[in-house]
Amino acid sequence: MQVTFLGTSSGVPTRARNVSAVALRLPQRSEMWLFDCGEGTQHQFLRSELRLSQLRRVFVTHMHGDHVFGLPGLLASLGLAGNSNEGVDLYGPDPLESYLNGVLRTSSTRIGYPLKVHRVHDCAENGTLVYEDDDLMVRCTPLTHRVPAYAYRVDQKPLAGRFDIAKAKDLQIPPGPIYAQLKRGDTVTLEDGRVIDGTTLCGPERPGVSVVYCTDTVFCEAAVDLAQGADLLIHESTFAHQESEMAYQKQHSTSTMAAQTAAEANVGQLVLTHLSPRYAPGNAVTPEDLLKEAQAIFPNTCLAKDFLTLEVKPRCNSL
């Protein structure tokens, strides 16, 4: 998995940071998922190496404009980018469908591919999966914000153990398509009549990776529970610690709240995003100050910036 930040500012864009959007690339299936879609996100795609035509799913955390104003335009442009017949599935709060229908209808915009909206409220409340396929699972949980908001967790299912080619050659198993079957752990009958159990040629299962996207929220235990043991936690950090009172009033997180969540959840790495424009470089408090505050609590923290790309690895610990 690869994570690319397309927008890392809160509320409004700045010269250096667009508003919220994070792309999750799944290279093994030539597919991409998007988390939030603030105004200007499709322009960010044009400035990146991402291919909009690979977009398959969009997960929306909440209905504030800096997280959704870019969605109608992006979906309209997607039809011109050669989107596949599979279409796009969207997941989010209850008002997401009526919002999109209203904008598309009043602007006389026609979407020429399948588009389906899934409400996540019941999944969040009941602890059921938002999405699952052969390789991945997605869960969500309610956050504490001024409007209904949800954090999402993507878990890759365990990977098959590594195939021992040397052992296969020692057994005089001829190379070819049969190796693919054995790699999957299938039992195969060879032309000479021998029956080979593929699991005997594979090492132990390897853990998949996990990513949690958590915004907008003040510190809450639900976020800690969702993020338990995750390899990568992307967490909003709207305010510096000295603005804690304002953070509680507006139900946003400080840098120290994000770090506290990461520490209590025992994640591999924390990335701070959704920074208030007030912390621009050269101001009294800068993004680097927020980073230092978080690192004092959770050392393996980095600061997101637009177009930063991370390769997600088990217990993610490096850029």
Curated annotation (Swiss-Prot):
Signal peptide annotation: none
Enzyme Commission number, as recorded: 3.1.26.11
Annotated binding of Zn(2+) 1, by residue: 62, 64, 145, 216
UniProt xrefs under Pfam families: Lactamase_B_2
Catalytic activity, reaction form: Endonucleolytic cleavage of RNA, removing extra 3' nucleotides from tRNA precursor, generating 3' termini of tRNAs. A 3'-hydroxy group is left at the tRNA terminus and a 5'-phosphoryl group is left at the trailer molecule
Active site: 66
Cofactor binding description: Binds 2 Zn(2+) ions.
Gene3D superfamilies: Ribonuclease Z/Hydroxyacylglutathione hydrolase-like
Cofactor(s), names only, from the UniProt record: Zn(2+)
Keywords carried by this UniProt record: Endonuclease, Hydrolase, Metal-binding, Nuclease, tRNA processing, Zinc
The keyword NADP is annotated on this UniProt entry: no
Molecular function GO labels: 3'-tRNA processing endoribonuclease activity; zinc ion binding
Function field: Zinc phosphodiesterase, which displays some tRNA 3'-processing endonuclease activity. Probably involved in tRNA maturation, by removing a 3'-trailer from precursor tRNA.
Protein name: Ribonuclease Z
Name of the gene this protein is made from: rnz
